[in-house]
């Protein structure tokens, strides 16, 4: 988004605020600034990107969200984020992001990534919806969850053709850079 190498946590807030978004004059807003700008005008999805088994970011964001009056939901690939919200903020809509990780070369042979692909942790996290990569719509666990009544969402649809191809497999769609 900014043409800079590294992860967000590699930089200080001051360094991040100097970076420009997509070759524009816009800078990266803090989450607090984002909430003030949105101010309940539109619903939003907050995706937690946990790269380790700790939920401090959930606690910090929740402090800013607990008095927010607008509509939002959270989603994450990491089941611990959903588990944290189930325990501390059960009224917040939770979504499990998923795909068939075991198909990726870097995860081949990983037991953890295989069980994540098959939504095994849903027993504990009890997500309100499952957001599965549309390229893996045939995943048996995703299909079972849908048959059992789980709201089935897909990401990220980038064309009208992808949307049409997936209409029967999913209930809701997350679009990215798409004009229908």
Segments (PLM) and residue ranges:
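An active-site metal/cofactor-coordinating segment within enzyme catalytic domains
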Residues: 1-40, 49, 92-112, 116-117, ...
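Conserved, mostly hydrophobic/aromatic
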Residues: 16, 34, 46, 74, ...
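Surface-exposed cleft-lining segments at the edges of enzyme active sites
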Residues: 20-23, 47-51, 63-72, 128-129
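C-terminal active-site rim and adjoining tail of enzyme catalytic domains
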Residues: 26-28, 104-180
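Acidic (Asp/Glu)-rich catalytic clusters
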Residues: 33-41, 61-67, 86-89, 123-124, ...
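Structural preference for beta-strand elements that scaffold enzyme active sites
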Residues: 43-45, 71-75, 91-95, 128-131, ...
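Helix N-cap/beta->alpha junction signal
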Residues: 50, 78-79, 134, 159
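Distinct, well-ordered alpha-helical segments
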Residues: 54-65, 81-92, 106-113
């Amino acid at each position: 988004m900014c043409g800079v190498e590294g992860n967000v946590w590699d930089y200080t807030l001051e360094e991040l605020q100097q970076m420009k978004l997509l070759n524009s004059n816009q800078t990266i807003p803090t989450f607090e600034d984002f909430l003030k700008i949105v101010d309940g005008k539109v619903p939003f999805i907050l995706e937690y990107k946990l790269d380790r088994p700790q939920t401090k970011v959930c606690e910090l964001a929740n402090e800013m969200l607990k008095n927010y009056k607008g509509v939002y939901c959270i989603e994450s690939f990491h089941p611990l984020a959903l588990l944290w919200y189930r325990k501390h903020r059960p009224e917040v809509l939770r979504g499990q992001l998923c795909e068939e990780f075991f198909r990726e070369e870097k995860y081949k042979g990983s037991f953890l990534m295989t069980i994540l692909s098959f939504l095994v942790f849903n027993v504990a996290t009890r997500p309100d919806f499952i957001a599965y990569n549309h390229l893996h719509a045939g995943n048996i666990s995703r299909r079972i969850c849908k048959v059992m009544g789980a709201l089935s969402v897909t990401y990220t649809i980038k064309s009208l053709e992808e949307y049409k191809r997936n209409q029967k497999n999913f209930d809701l769609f997350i679009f990215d850079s798409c004009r229908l």
